[in-house]
């Protein structure tokens, strides 16, 4: 969809004049930009209900922002920023271990782990790599080819201006649709249809997929290769990449277990994502926020809290650790533009992991340009600076913080990818939190997955990942539309990539290391923060949005300074706000 309409954005320039919030080498000053409008708010929002209006006001700026991104002519060749960064980070650490002749910390390997399993089974490697691969993967080659060819064939089909406008209208007007009954009926038909379709291909005998997966994991942990492959064969007979939630769970966990056995999964990023393009990321994001409130509620809580804090501020400085594409900020920018006293000067410091190649900061620079254009539309003064480094290597001297400004540190769903003390004795995770405290912000906004699958022991980690991912697969099957390509992409980006890391990798190669909200709380308190209680009105509004707009099994709850999001009683995400213990 990046090549839908190749229209360059003209009239935007860089300058190194005064008033920048950062060093001259990466200043982003004001310039002119052409405004593209394909959405009439007055026409699309006629007579909305109060709750629907509230939902629309939260969604529309994001969809406008995505609209502008889709107009960029070089989007097709770009891959996902986070995938590239994590792949580079894992490669650097692996290379460093080789140079230093280091081995993973012993706590990360147990009797049941397979850190050295590849050497033990080297005599059987030809059998695994040829016969096993041919037996287990040939079945899905046609499905993969169909999926890829389908995606490629769809891009040229929407290259005309009329079809482009239709796609934009679908994105921008999605929050106006209030047809939950119809959507639920479609989802039900989709689930039933897919189940019937795969029942014809798979065995009709019901199986306990979780039990099979646990038995296979136990065989892997005890180095019983024969039994492990027997269980893998049984799992594959009852699983499919495009089946129901249980079949998908079995398929992808079997892939991860086989990768662990054969030792072929050293960089799970490349194997699971094949460098997902920016266009596909936008498609997945659009479908995800329509069906699941988890990410939207993280942004909603953070933005509302920041907006209340900066209600009278003349300068608001947001230091965003993990800014990615800046999807969080269009809503806040629009809210700031509506202040009675006028918008403040918005300074954003975008921090990301470096990209591979000769321009490690290229993507985070592009995010600044997009935010600049969006601020110009709403007449919000804007300054932007960027840092592309591993977070543990960033120091206070890299940041430019002025006196008298309201400073906010923001970190949403990214700290789990920072290594902990099991990778390095000087925990990069704690180092990053100490930096957050050294910034001495007026507010620290934090959100993370509530995950229990960070144990150094493989079996414990596998079991907890199995329970967590079962809930996610069930949630996506229940809520996402029948567009199988979109659902597959969302699952790949939000479940499979991390599951591959957790199951197939050890040491520095395991990049996903989530913790429970209680463990995060201990770390944050130790870094020198104290909890800031969430506004009751914000929590109330969030509950109303989820209740009116989303599936009834989504749950929003709060406990003092934490807001929890869950699915069928299981807490999946947690959001909180913090202030320095001593200002």
From Swiss-Prot:
Pfam family, one: GRAS
Region described as SAW: 504-579
Compositional bias ranges of the Polar residues kind: 115-124
InterPro entries with a match to the protein in the record: TF_GRAS (IPR005202)
Sequence segments annotated as region (PFYRE): 407-501
GO terms for biological process, alphabetical: regulation of DNA-templated transcription
Biased composition (Basic and acidic residues): 131-140
Region annotation (VHIID) ranges: 285-350
Compartments (UniProt record): Nucleus
Motif (VHIID): 316-320
Region (Leucine repeat I (LRI)) residue spans: 207-266
Tissue: Expressed in seedlings, leaves, sepals, stamen and pistil, and in the quiescent center of root meristem.
GO MF annotation list: DNA-binding transcription factor activity; transcription cis-regulatory region binding
Region ranges (Disordered): 107-154, 182-205
Annotated segments matching region Leucine repeat II (LRII): 366-398
Family, per entry: Belongs to the GRAS family.
Subunit structure and binding partners: Interacts with SNRNP35 and CYP95.
Record protein name field: Scarecrow-like protein 30
Species this chain originates from: Arabidopsis thaliana
């Amino acid at each position: 969809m990046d090549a839908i309409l190749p229209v360059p954005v003209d009239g935007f320039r860089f300058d190194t004049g005064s008033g920048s919030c950062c060093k001259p080498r990466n200043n982003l000053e004001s310039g002119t930009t052409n405004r593209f409008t394909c959405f009439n708010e007055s026409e699309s929002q006629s007579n909305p209900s109060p709750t629907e209006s509230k939902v629309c006001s939260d969604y529309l700026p994001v969809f406008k922002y995505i609209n502008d991104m889709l107009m960029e002519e070089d989007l097709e060749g770009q891959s996902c920023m986070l995938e590239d960064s994590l792949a580079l980070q894992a490669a650097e650490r692996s290379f460093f271990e080789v140079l230093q002749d280091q081995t993973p910390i012993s706590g990360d390997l147990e009797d049941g782990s397979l850190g050295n399993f590849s050497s033990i089974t080297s005599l059987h490697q030809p059998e695994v790599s040829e016969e096993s691969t041919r037996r287990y993967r040939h079945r899905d080659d046609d499905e993969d080819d169909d999926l890829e060819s389908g995606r490629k064939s769809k891009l040229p089909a929407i290259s005309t201006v009329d079809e482009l406008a239709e796609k934009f209208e679908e994105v921008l007007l999605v929050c106006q649709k209030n047809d939950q009954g119809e959507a639920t009926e479609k989802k039900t038909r989709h689930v039933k249809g897919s189940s019937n379709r795969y029942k014809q291909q798979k065995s009709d005998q019901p199986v306990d997929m979780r039990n099979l997966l646990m038995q296979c994991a136990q065989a892997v942990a005890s180095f019983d290769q024969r039994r492990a492959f027997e269980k893998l064969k049984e799992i594959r007979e009852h699983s499919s990449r495009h089946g129901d939630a249980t079949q998908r769970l079995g398929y992808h966990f079997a892939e991860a277990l086989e990768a662990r056995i054969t030792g072929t999964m050293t960089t799970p990023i490349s194997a699971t994502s094949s460098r997902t393009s920016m266009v596909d990321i936008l498609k997945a994001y659009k479908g995800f926020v329509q069906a699941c409130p988890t990410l939207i509620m993280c942004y909603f809580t953070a933005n509302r809290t920041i907006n209340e804090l900066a209600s009278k501020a003349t300068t608001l400085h947001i230091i965003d650790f993990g800014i990615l594409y800046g999807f969080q900020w269009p809503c806040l920018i629009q809210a700031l533009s509506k202040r009675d006293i006028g918008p403040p000067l918005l300074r954003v410091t975008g921090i990301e992991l470096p990209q591979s190649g000769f321009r490690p900061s290229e993507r985070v620079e592009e995010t600044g340009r997009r935010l600049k254009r969006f601020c110009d539309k709403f007449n919000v003064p804007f300054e932007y600076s960027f840092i592309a480094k591993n977070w543990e290597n960033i120091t206070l001297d890299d940041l430019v913080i002025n006196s008298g400004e309201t400073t906010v540190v923001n970190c949403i769903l990214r700290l789990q990818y920072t290594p902990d003390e099991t990778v390095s004795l000087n925990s990069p995770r704690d180092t990053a939190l100490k930096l957050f405290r050294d910034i001495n912000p007026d507010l620290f906004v934090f959100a993370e997955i509530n995950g229990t699958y960070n144990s150094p022991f493989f079996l414990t980690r596998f079991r907890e990942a199995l329970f967590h991912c079962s809930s996610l697969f069930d949630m996506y099957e229940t809520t996402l539309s029948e567009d199988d390509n979109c659902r597959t992409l969302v699952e790949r980006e939000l479940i499979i990539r991390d599951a591959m890391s957790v199951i197939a990798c050890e040491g520095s190669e395991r990049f996903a290391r989530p913790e429970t909200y209680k463990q995060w709380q201990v770390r944050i308190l130790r870094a020198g923060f104290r909890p800031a209680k969430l506004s009751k009105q914000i929590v109330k509004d969030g509950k109303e949005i989820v209740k009116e707009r989303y599936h009834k099994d989504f749950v929003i709850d709060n406990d003092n300074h934490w807001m929890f999001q869950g699915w069928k009683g299981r807490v999946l995400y947690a959001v909180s706000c913090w202030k320095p213990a001593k200002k």
